[in-house]
Amino acid sequence: MIFGKTHFLSYNILRYSTKRWMNRHSYSHHAKCTVAQLLKQNLLTFENQRIQPEEELKENLTKVVNYFQAPIDVAVGYGSGVFRQAGYSQKENPMIDFIFQVEDPVKWHKINLQQNPSHYSFVKNFGPGFVSTLQESFGTGVYYNTHVEVEGNIIKYGVTSKKDVYEDLKNWNTMYLAGRFQKPVVILKGEDEFYKENSYNLSSALHVGLLMLADRFTEFDLYKTIVSLSYLGDIRMSFFAENPRKVENIVSKQIAFFRKLYLPLLYAEPGVHFIESSEVLKSMDPSDNSRYLSFHQNITKDSISRLLNGLPLNLVKILGLKPDTSSFEKCAELMLTNQISTRSLLISKSIKKLTSFSILTQSIKGIFTAGVIRSFVYVYAKLKKGLLSKWGR
């Protein structure tokens, strides 16, 4: 398909029609709920991950997923097209992002190439086997089709395998998928299968966040730290291809969802203490972003060692640790003698080392999978948003 004037016209029309539900979409799971109730969510049933959108939004997202004839095991909606971010006007309607976990990538692309050949760039000419190889052997194990029309929406969807999803969530092989799923997402299909694996990922993100923070911190500090992890090796942040205030915008607009995800984990974390009284927690609305909860964590050799023991395998390796108690204890003792800024810098550099190469190769792969013109449109939109955010509208 030629991405010319006709497509630009239809794209603008779709952006306008999409805003009818985008401007109204909201989430219902916080109705008549307090922060105190969020703390008591059942982590064994993954209650903290079950974010339920309003029916109108859920129907629209589900309609997109059901459009595809190729079988999808797990479907995830994420990003600013699903969750509003601060800094967007009501006239702006971001592209809707999806991740599709599939059982057999070759079979999936074969069916999808027959149904949606226009979604693919010139690589479709080499067949589903080549597409699948490009997906799994280069970058982050995800193949994206971007700026395509599905059921009246402009979407981007990434296709990945079960193996790549689970390895990244548990071990942070590239942290590409894990980083996205550390933020609020909507699971449209395959909930229980996904939640179990992502629980490891959320705990890992929390442990990293605590290691990078001082003994006293606010929940806003914690959520910003967690969100920033996936952007540490992202070259787009260096070249203004992302909003420089993106992290703050995500947290401030989605505070209720971050509280739902992480407050029960904090509540169950040994050595972390809520400073606010129980009366405050019982009266506080999860959506209230006019104030943030404060915490105190015990920073001792034992507490640091325990947090290190909860890190994913690949980060442990990059930190130069062996997965045994004595190695964690030695590192904890060293971290304890250094300032918090030194400890935070060490972890930041390690995560950047973990993510930067895979993000770079994924970006290069995107030029081929999206095609030159679609890639230009995508990068232009990112640059425009990033530069406008830096210098003002």
From Swiss-Prot:
Gene label: tam41
GO cellular component terms attached to this protein's record: extrinsic component of mitochondrial inner membrane; mitochondrial matrix; mitochondrion
Location in the cell: Mitochondrion inner membrane
Keywords for the protein's UniProt record, in alphabetical order: Lipid biosynthesis, Lipid metabolism, Magnesium, Membrane, Mitochondrion, Mitochondrion inner membrane, Nucleotidyltransferase, Phospholipid biosynthesis, Phospholipid metabolism, Transferase
Domain of life of the organism encoding this protein: Eukaryota
Name of protein: Phosphatidate cytidylyltransferase, mitochondrial
Catalytic activity: a 1,2-diacyl-sn-glycero-3-phosphate + CTP + H(+) = a CDP-1,2-diacyl-sn-glycerol + diphosphate
Pathway note: Phospholipid metabolism; CDP-diacylglycerol biosynthesis; CDP-diacylglycerol from sn-glycerol 3-phosphate: step 3/3
Membrane topology designation: Peripheral membrane protein
Family per record: Belongs to the TAM41 family.
EC number of the protein: 2.7.7.41
Cofactor(s) this protein requires: Mg(2+)
Keyword Transport: no
Pfam families linked: Tam41_Mmp37 (PF09139)
Principal place of residence: mitochondrion
Molecular functions per Gene Ontology: cardiolipin binding; phosphatidate cytidylyltransferase activity; phosphatidic acid binding
Natural source organism: Schizosaccharomyces pombe (strain 972 / ATCC 24843)
Its biological purpose: Catalyzes the formation of CDP-diacylglycerol (CDP-DAG) from phosphatidic acid (PA) in the mitochondrial inner membrane. Required for the biosynthesis of the dimeric phospholipid cardiolipin, which stabilizes supercomplexes of the mitochondrial respiratory chain in the mitochondrial inner membrane.
One GO-annotated biological process of the protein: mitochondrial membrane organization
